[in-house]
């Protein structure tokens, strides 16, 4: 496996501005990030969500055997899946939930007002439930407009719910914040202050020490992004890279097969 991509996702109306994609390949036993661009820069894309997500699907389809890290939930807690397998759940997702608001309210109703977490979210200490107020739009549009169409087309394999298939991109769920916290690298890095820009530089230097290299033109782009989304996409690509050997060693756990697994 030589090709690794990280996608910092957004379900916002101007998703093309918020989504960032880092594309890297292995070179001399290191991960070289060759490009890091906004979703609106993809061929056929725009700042608007509908056009951007269509372009993102096309980009993922064309990624051959890449391992792609996505930073949104790829499933729900098993208690909310109505006894379905993951494949049944994803195929019926758009029929079950007509809007992001309907999705959040249906989950809250089924959970008796609680924000349930999946086992993997508890294990990796991700900050939010998939239908938390800050995350539910991201979950909804990610599942409905990215994952479900690609799965129906058999254009991708979503791990660990599906087995690997040669020549087809593998998608995994990652969480940049959890990765940073696991490595004890976390510090407030989102914002326009000098301290927050310095924190982005510190994280980039930490990545460099573990073998992540950036094409020369990318460093100023990443440091200048005050929202930290460009950096998050690079962290997502690196999380995919460092998870490559873990994929085939992950225990065959029925709960992970339904709820998914966050690779940090």
Would you name each region that the model predicts?
Residues 1-5, 9-264:
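RNase H-like (RuvC/DEDD) metal-dependent nuclease/polynucleotide-processing core
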């Amino acid at each position: 496996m030589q090709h690794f991509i990280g996608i910092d996702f957004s379900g916002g109306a101007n998703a093309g501005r918020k989504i960032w994609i880092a594309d890297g390949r292995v070179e001399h036993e290191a991960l070289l990030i060759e490009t890091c661009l906004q979703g609106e820069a993809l061929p056929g894309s725009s700042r608007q969500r509908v056009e951007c997500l269509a372009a993102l699907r096309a980009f993922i389809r064309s990624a051959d055997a890449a391992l792609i890290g996505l930073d949104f939930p790829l499933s729900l807690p098993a208690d909310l899946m109505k006894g379905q397998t993951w494949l049944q759940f994803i195929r019926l997702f758009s029929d079950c939930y007509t809007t992001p608001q309907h999705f959040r309210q249906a989950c809250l109703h089924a959970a008796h007002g609680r924000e349930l977490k999946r086992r993997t979210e508890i294990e990796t200490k991700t900050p939010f439930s998939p239908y938390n107020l800050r995350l539910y739009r991201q979950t909804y549009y990610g599942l409905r407009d990215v994952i479900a169409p690609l799965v129906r087309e058999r254009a991708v394999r979503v791990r660990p719910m599906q087995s690997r298939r040669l020549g087809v991109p593998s998608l995994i769920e990652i969480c940049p914040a959890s990765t940073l916290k696991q490595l004890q690298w976390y510090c407030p890095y989102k914002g326009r202050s000098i301290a927050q820009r310095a924190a982005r530089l510190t994280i980039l230097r930490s990545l460099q020490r573990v073998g992540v290299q950036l094409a020369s033109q990318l460093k100023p782009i990443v440091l200048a992004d005050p929202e930290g989304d460009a950096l998050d996409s690079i962290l997502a690509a690196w999380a995919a890279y460092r998870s490559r050997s873990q994929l085939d060693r992950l225990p065959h756990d029925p709960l992970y097969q339904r709820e998914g697994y966050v690779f940090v």
